[in-house]
């Protein structure tokens, strides 16, 4: 069995496809004020690494692009670094810290707490994130 990097597929002995990608070479990058999302398409899914700089807030950085009252993308995230405070539309508020895994339904705002960038890997909800008209 061989493993192909990048956009290539390798076929395992049983006909299964093996893919290996790296966030250092994303398929797409979406930039917005004080942040960016690096997207990788793999196994039929879109995985995103989001980097939010200090001072980033969804309501001011992404809302003008999304044109929705709050973030409508559900998220299933692993929090790599920094602190991300989340405010749900129902009023629940909590912090996501390094090592946390969060499952957020649509209907929320979020912002970086402190002076360290918040970095998350999102396994759901990145397909249309920070895309005009979402």
Predicted segments with their positions:
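Double-stranded beta-helix
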Residues: 2-9, 13-23, 111-134
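Short beta-strand segments in beta-sandwich/barrel cores
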Residues: 57-58, 82-87, 110
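A short, N-terminal "cap"/entry segment at the start of jelly-roll beta-barrel domains
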Residues: 1-51, 59
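Conserved hydrophobic/aromatic beta-strand scaffold that supports enzyme active sites
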Residues: 39, 47-51, 76, 93, ...
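Conserved short histidine dyad/triad with adjacent acidic residue
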Residues: 49-71
């Amino acid at each position: 069995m061989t493993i192909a990097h990048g956009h290539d597929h390798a076929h395992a002995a049983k006909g299964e496809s093996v893919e290996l990608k790296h966030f250092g070479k994303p398929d797409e990058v979406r930039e917005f004020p004080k942040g960016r999302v690096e997207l990788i398409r793999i196994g039929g899914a879109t995985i995103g690494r989001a980097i939010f700089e200090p001072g980033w807030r969804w309501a001011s950085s992404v809302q003008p692009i999304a044109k929705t009252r709050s973030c409508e993308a559900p998220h299933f995230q692993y929090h790599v670094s920094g602190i991300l405070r989340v405010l749900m539309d129902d009023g629940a508020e909590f912090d996501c810290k390094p090592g946390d895994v969060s499952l957020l339904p649509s209907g929320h705002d979020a912002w970086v707490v402190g002076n360290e960038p918040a970095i998350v890997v999102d396994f759901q909800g990145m397909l249309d994130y920070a895309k005009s008209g979402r």
